Amino acid sequence: MKKIAFFSIPAHGHTNPMLPVAAELVRRGNTVRFYSFDVFENKIRATGADFVSCDAFLGNLTKKEEAGLKKVSTTEMTIQDIRITLQMDTFLDGEFKKFRPDVVYSDSVCFWGKLNAWKHHVPLVVSTSTFAFNRMSSRYLKNSLKETADMIFGMPKIAKELKKLEPCGYNVKNALSLVQSDNETDSVVYTSKRFQPYSESFSDHYVFVGPSVFSGTAPSKEKERPLVYVSMGTVINDRPDFYAKCIEALILYIFIYINCRAYGTV
């Protein structure tokens, strides 16, 4: 049996898909140690995994600052992740020497998980909660003028922060190498291959498994009907207009293809 270290960022949309994976690995007799944050402790322990709190490495935020995270730029978010990695360095050095994981399973944007896997020469498997990103992504990702400017002017700032990682044994070419998928790293992607843009450009190291939902309560389904799962991430979940459009689209689809009136009250 293997010892597996899980790493994720403090976000529901990135942590939740990893929970069924942890539960299945534990069920098969593996030891899973999940490095996460206190808000997820109960969910993680429910999988049978060991929970390790990383809250001490996050700054204390006021309610106003916490709300402001939803508007933070890509540059600021990247720099913050690099700084958290530096703050966790001594702690994770000790954890890797003590736990000695056989595999690291890290969220795709959890820098401290990926960087420590590379630093300690432990095989890495990447958990991708959205689409996988590679060189083809620029063909369908349309950045606003503000986002483009942020990337252009933010690169020197990020490069400066990356330099601070070198004395700690982290060798990083550039920021893209931290977030962009490569065809040599084993990756689990929580969408279907049909929904992944340019899926043919990804190697066999990628497994597209579809939505991953972990819950002790199964949805009530008195009738054998399809289940529609709609989910947004932590950062942009407060979007009632989006959910309303999903409901509207579903109702329109049903009435176009099915004569619901023939079934009585819907």
Predicted regions located by residue number:
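Short gly/ser/thr-rich secondary-structure transition/capping motifs
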Residues: 86-87, 107, 168-172, 212-216
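Glycosyltransferase specificity loop/lid
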Residues: 1-151, 237, 241-266
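Donor-nucleotide binding loops and adjacent catalytic segments primarily
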Residues: 195-266
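Alpha-helix C-terminal capping/helix-to-coil transition sites in glycosyltransferase folds
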Residues: 98-100, 183, 224
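Short, basic, glycine/proline-bearing loop/turn elements
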Residues: 76-80, 157-164, 227-234
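Active-site-proximal region of nucleotide-activated glycan assembly enzymes
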Residues: 123-197, 203-204
